[in-house]
Amino acid sequence: MILRKRAEEILSLVQRTEKEISSSDEVIMGDVYIGAGETDTIRFIARAAKKIQNRHPDIHYHVSSGNSEYVLESLDRGLIDFGLLFSSIDTQKYDFISLPVKDIWGVLMRRDSPLAQKETVSPEDLWDKPLIISHQRNSSQYLADWFKKDMASLHVVATYNLVFNASLLVDEGLGYALSFDKLINTRESGLCFRPLSPKLEASAYIVWKKYQIFSKAAGAFLECLREEAGYAVQEEKA
């Protein structure tokens, strides 16, 4: 299975290289590969892709979802051009753009839960509750600092990779899921989302390998991302 996986990765790289070589100098076309976790911040990438589509309609985007370990491994193997991450960045290995958007941590719960009556949720509210958390190592440390407790001392009943699956566990009454806001549409459902207090936010970064030689398509997309990030920062300060 390992040899087969490596062969598929090599074939994918060969196919990408062939497309890049066949691309005209005058017409920018090709594929851009992006790895990302589940986040509303993907809208930022979508806006940049939409903007560049007007100028270069033959650029195609391929988005794969996974946790930070998956994204970084895919970057290191050359399977993706860019990663969207919320963890700290190893600046010895990667270059990055800091995005002017943040994701807000909170709790996904049933509407008939006692905590649903509160506007925000404190660490003490959750100390004795059954919790469903992301199985990413960096997220666990991030949350442990907010909880003011070691995660091992909390009542973690389940971990998840995809928040949609976590929402089903919540809906069935298994526990309270900690996740980013805006990932599950709770409108007209039996679930609701409450932000954490003190407020806990996650900064977003677009990451790529240092000294990366980009295809024309990926290079054009990176330029557009830089423009969008700059404009967004200016608008925020205005």
Annotate each predicted stretch with a short phrase.
Residues 67-80, 85-86, 136-192:
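Hydrophobic hinge/microswitch elements
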Residues 27, 31-35, 83, 108, ...:
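Short, well-ordered beta-strand segments
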Residues 116, 129-151, 214-223, 229-236:
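Secondary-structure junction motif
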Residues 27-91, 151, 159-162:
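Central regulatory/effector-binding core of bacterial HTH transcription factors
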Residues 1-29, 230:
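Alpha-helical "hinge/linker" immediately C-terminal to small N-terminal DNA-binding modules
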Residues 44, 193-235:
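A late-sequence structural motif
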Residues 92-98, 102-104, 164-211:
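Beta-alpha-beta core module
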